[in-house]
């Protein structure tokens, strides 16, 4: 597990409480654009970053593990001299958040886990997807991915934004995407969920076909200080489809636990 220096952007009050935003497979830090104004206006120092293998972060050869992705977060906090942060992660980002909550709990004030899962099988599905991407590129999986990310109604109402997200996925380096599929294929976060001590907000999209509400329920049942919110209409990228609801939930959680 060797950390890489991931690409990041910091916005908001330099002295505000830090909030780290960690994104999904196939995304880059632009996926959090709907959260930035709400968090910075409320006085937070917002740190967004690209997962390794994604966006403008380095692409070391895979496979990656969640320990690798978690080590990148700890190294980023060290680089920014942040002792503890509020961590908000969606999907793969939420998995990274659970890893940090389990193995480096002292680095977290709170955890917000959006549209994620502690166990997302079958493993063969991730191996198959990685093989497709290595053979044909990320463009081969981008259209199917946006169909999981957004409800049909949202896609119909926002064709340009849907295309932009599809382009974001298609521009993700194939090796980075495939190597992160391996991290999901091999992850095992369930047994240690009770070790997460951070106050945890779990948010699920009611219409999410990728990490459905039942997965969020399992996390909320196992994490001692967790609370579950199911919101809709929203598919996998609920932070984009329902930014107002998600922002209010995040801000409420941070304020309750500062
Ligand atoms: O399959 C998808 O695109 C949904 C997803 C699973 C993990 C992740 O980060 O995104």
Task: Show where each model-derived region lies.
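Catalytic histidine-centered segment of alpha/beta-hydrolase-like enzymes
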Residues: 234-243, 247
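Gly/Ala-rich beta-loop-alpha elbow adjacent to hydrolase catalytic centers
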Residues: 89, 93, 97
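Catalytic histidine neighborhood in serine/cysteine hydrolases
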Residues: 217-237
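Conserved alpha/beta-hydrolase catalytic His-Asp/Glu region
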Residues: 121-124, 136-195
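Short beta-strand/loop motif that positions the catalytic acidic residue
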Residues: 196, 202-204, 208
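Flexible "cap/lid" loop of the alpha/beta hydrolase fold
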Residues: 98-103, 107-137, 142
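Conserved HGGG/HGGXW glycine-rich cap/lid loop of the alpha/beta-hydrolase fold
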Residues: 7-59
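Conserved acidic catalytic loop of the alpha/beta-hydrolase fold
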Residues: 68-85
């Amino acid at each position: 597990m060797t950390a890489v220096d991931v690409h990041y952007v910091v916005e908001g009050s330099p002295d505000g409480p830090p909030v780290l935003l960690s994104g999904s497979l196939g995304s880059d830090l632009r996926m959090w654009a709907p959260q930035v104004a709400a968090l910075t206006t409320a006085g937070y120092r917002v740190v967004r970053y690209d997962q390794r293998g994604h966006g403008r972060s380095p692409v070391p050869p895979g496979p990656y593990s969640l320990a690798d992705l978690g080590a990148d977060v700890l190294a980023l906090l060290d680089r920014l001299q942040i002792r503890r942060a509020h961590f908000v992660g969606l999907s793969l980002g939420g998995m990274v958040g659970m890893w940090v909550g389990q193995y480096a709990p002292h680095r977290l004030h709170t955890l917000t886990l959006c549209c994620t899962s502690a166990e997302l099988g079958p493993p063969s599905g991730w191996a198959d997807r990685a093989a497709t991407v290595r053979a044909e590129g990320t463009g081969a999986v981008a259209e199917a991915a946006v169909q999981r990310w957004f409800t049909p109604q949202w896609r119909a109402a926002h064709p340009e934004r849907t295309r932009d997200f599809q382009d974001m996925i298609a521009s993700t380096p194939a090796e980075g995407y495939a190597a992160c599929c391996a991290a999901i294929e091999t992850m095992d976060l369930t047994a240690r969920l009770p070790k997460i001590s951070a106050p945890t907000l779990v948010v699920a999209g009611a219409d999410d076909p990728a990490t459905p509400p039942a997965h969020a329920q399992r996390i909320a049942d196992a994490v001692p200080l967790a609370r579950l919110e199911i919101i809709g209409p929203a598919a996998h990228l609920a932070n984009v489809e329902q930014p107002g609801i998600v922002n209010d939930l995040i801000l409420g959680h941070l304020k309750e636990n500062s």
